[in-house]
Amino acid sequence: MNFSGSPVQLPLLQVHLPGEVPYRTAWAWQQARLAHMIRDPQLPDGLLLLTHPAVYTLGAGADPKFLKSLSQPIGSPAIHPESPSEQEPEILRVERGGEVTYHGPGQWVGYAMLNLKRHRPDLHEYLRQLEEVVIQTLAHFGLQGERIPGLTGVWVQGRKVAAIGIKVSRWVTYHGFALNVCPDLAAFEAIVPCGIPDRPVGSLVHFCPEVTMAAVAPVLVESFCQVFGLQAQAVSLAEWLGEPRLSDKLLGESTAQTPKRK
């Protein structure tokens, strides 16, 4: 499937949309693809677009004070707890930059894995490009996305609708962006989102009540391709991981349906 519909033969972007995936699982998928991309510089760029069950994550240098009243222990995505709580979302410290944020249903999370040696090896420019992906997506729905000097992310009418946090290894990127479409914004009240106390969080549905997750997904992919000069190709999980001989069932893929444009 060609998301962009472009007749020009652009470099490929391998896209996988598995639905809802636990954070630890998606983290492991990124680690697997990262190893392949470092080992094989010819492997195409990749985008994993999914949703998570409720979870809070902190960047590598994030300050726990922004957790406010949350008292759960801070874990690692690489270590599975012996007795996970079914009542409270986990709190995980990960490699990305940035402070604490929330992921949950109603939010598209995009894990962008690009070899920046094929683009522009400039991390500040890369952050601005991820913001531009969101800004172009918002424009499709008639919304004006805004940047705030000195901060990373995208705002609409003063409300932050997209958070961005990245990690780069040998110029291969991972982690990425989170776009609030229709999440439960009450979940953000337990934290100081991104460590910014005076900037409220918002969502697309607040400004466009009829917008759906299914409608936003293909626009995000198309905007990503426009910004980075790529052509999207939908692939299986095994292909996305660089392990085409393995079945998705063995890799533990979510059984959720891939969203389609309405």
From Swiss-Prot:
Cited InterPro entries: aa-tRNA-synth_II/BPL/LPL, BPL_LPL_catalytic, Octanoyltransferase, Octanoyltransferase_CS
Q: For this UniProt entry, what's an example GO CC term?
A: cytoplasm
Additional note from the record: In the reaction, the free carboxyl group of octanoic acid is attached via an amide linkage to the epsilon-amino group of a specific lysine residue of lipoyl domains of lipoate-dependent enzymes.
Which parts of the sequence belong to the BPL/LPL catalytic domain?
41-232
Say where the protein is mainly found: cytoplasm
Site features described as Lowers pKa of active site Cys, chain residue numbers: 160
Enzyme's top EC category: transferase
Q: What is the lineage of its organism?
A: Bacteria, Bacillati, Cyanobacteriota, Cyanophyceae, Synechococcales
Please state what the protein is called. Octanoyltransferase
Q: Which family does it belong to?
A: Belongs to the LipB family.
Q: Which domain of life is it from?
A: Bacteria
Q: Which residues, if any, are the signal sequence? A: none
The task this protein performs is described as:
Catalyzes the transfer of endogenously produced octanoic acid from octanoyl-acyl-carrier-protein onto the lipoyl domains of lipoate-dependent enzymes. Lipoyl-ACP can also act as a substrate although octanoyl-ACP is likely to be the physiological substrate.
Its annotated compartments are: Cytoplasm
Which keywords has UniProt assigned to this entry?
Acyltransferase, Cytoplasm, Transferase
Would I find Cytoplasm among this entry's keywords?
A: yes
**EC number in record:** 2.3.1.181
